[in-house]
Amino acid sequence: MRTATAFTGVRPARRRATKRTKITKNSRLATVGRSQTPVLRAATPADAHAIHALITAHIREGHLLPRSLEDIEAHATRFIVAIDRDRLVACADLAALSPLVAEVRSLVVDESARSKGLGQQIVNELARRARVAGFDSLCAFTHSAGYFVRMGFSIVPHPWIPEKIEADCRACPLFRQCGQYAVTLPLAHGVESFVPLASLHG
């Protein structure tokens, strides 16, 4: 496992620093905006119902696949979530397709929290975690390819991600008529902070 370090003196600067959300070994937290909300953190099983509700509420937009509550409960710790005033407003799942390829799944930002960069911050954190876990690439299947391209992903033919096809696509009724783009991001392995990642491979 690659390890390394994680991501004075006037009093005002020191006082502001103490108000920031603490970064712990179990989850890297981030804040957005001067009010320090929303906050990004690793999800826990206690978040499963809120994650399920957020995904279900946005399925009608046509960009998400349904996820059962049982599935989310089983994989809750793979999610990164954004919390705004005690309300879960964004999430995404980091799923292992193979020992070398991970996938961004169920990326959704509630309409009330959009245009704040939350989606990009969540994807960046998932990419960081995938890199630490030893994956060589991060992929996604999406209707919004341009969104991912702006984050450094490349559009590729679906067969270039055979792990996804074997894991999910062949069982999909739209397999031969898929309207999604396949995008992929190579992960350069560098110095990263340690985060617990056992759940990604189990």
What are these regions (language model features)?
Residues 71-85, 103, 176-179:
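A short helix-loop-beta-strand connector motif used in the catalytic cores of GNAT acetyltransferases and
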Residues 110, 188:
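Residue-level recognition of the GNAT/N-acetyltransferase active site
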Residues 81, 87-96, 100-108:
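Conserved beta-strand in the GNAT
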Residues 6-9, 18-25, 31:
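Short, low-complexity, charge-dense intrinsically disordered segments
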Residues 67-69, 167-173:
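Short, P/G- and charge-enriched loop/turn segments at secondary-structure junctions
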Residues 109, 115-130, 140:
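Conserved acetyl-CoA-binding loop-helix of GNAT-fold acetyltransferases
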Residues 132, 136, 142-170:
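Conserved active-site alpha-helix within GNAT-family acetyltransferase domains
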Residues 25-66, 83, 180-182, 189-202:
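Short amphipathic alpha-helix that is part of the acyltransferase structural core
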